[in-house]
């Protein structure tokens, strides 16, 4: 399997494009100067385009992906707020942008050439939406709103129009601050990292989502303000990882067979202030970015235990905060 790693460094307005080999080694393919501070990134479902959100001129930039993973800019379109997280539907027809600072969620059409256009819907009045996550069936969009302590749920029509389902929303503990989500491959369980108390909520789907577990991701005796960031699951659904920026820790959970129960298995020091990380498509490697270290690091994931072993660190641009992996 050929894989490419994209790292976004907003403080230097750069994307670094890396080749990832089977031994977990990275080789730099390209350094792209982006027309703004690049933050969230997402690969299109057909793996032909990379979409990135930039500021201060709030926009989505469309890049065509070449045969080696290299990028060529194809288009740029405006959005109504600073992009905190972007995603697409499963068919690659719509792009969703959540704006934490501007308290809105937008829907943009993606044309037949894979280029993102202007927004066709803007939903205002959300309090600090931090991500937009399409479900397995491509029917519902789940939006954790950090300052509301709830996950709003929107039904998606065929033309991409979103309608909120207030009766189905998920509430968290007061002051938890829901942020990012990971989806189990069994299509029944979702995990949400809460930024402010560093817990992980486990939601299982029946007629509606129900919280079946809340577990702390950090050592009980850890001092300091909690500031969790990212969450990802291995492709086989056996291991879950979260990052926390004050302690610069990656936390590891073992997942039960049905996905409903997490067991904390360990903590690992990583890059300073790990805002974003990713797991490769083989489930063998975890790539973490350090906003304060200006480096990324690659760690191997033990196939059976899920234990992390750091392999190598690589310098990138300034303030790296997002990692995306593409399987060519």
From Swiss-Prot:
GO biological process: glucose metabolic process; pentose-phosphate shunt, oxidative branch
Organism lineage string: Bacteria, Pseudomonadati, Pseudomonadota, Gammaproteobacteria, Enterobacterales
Pathway where it operates: Carbohydrate degradation; pentose phosphate pathway; D-ribulose 5-phosphate from D-glucose 6-phosphate (oxidative stage): step 2/3
Catalysed conversion reaction: 6-phospho-D-glucono-1,5-lactone + H2O = 6-phospho-D-gluconate + H(+)
Name by which UniProt lists this protein: 6-phosphogluconolactonase
Record family assignment: Belongs to the cycloisomerase 2 family.
UniProt keyword annotation of Hydrolase present: yes
InterPro entries, A to Z: 6-phosphogluconolactonase_YbhE, Cycloisomerase_2, Lactonase_7-beta_prop, N2O_reductase_N, WD40/YVTN_repeat-like_dom_sf
Organism of provenance: Photorhabdus laumondii subsp. laumondii (strain DSM 15139 / CIP 105565 / TT01) (Photorhabdus luminescens subsp. laumondii)
Pfam families in the cross-refs: Lactonase (PF10282)
Gene3D superfamilies: YVTN repeat-like/Quinoprotein amine dehydrogenase (2.130.10.10)
Broad enzyme group: hydrolase
EC number of the protein: 3.1.1.31
Molecular function terms, GO-annotated: 6-phosphogluconolactonase activity
Keyword annotations: Carbohydrate metabolism, Glucose metabolism, Hydrolase
Superkingdom, taxonomy of origin: Bacteria
Cellular component aspect of the GO annotation: cytosol
Protein role: Catalyzes the hydrolysis of 6-phosphogluconolactone to 6-phosphogluconate.
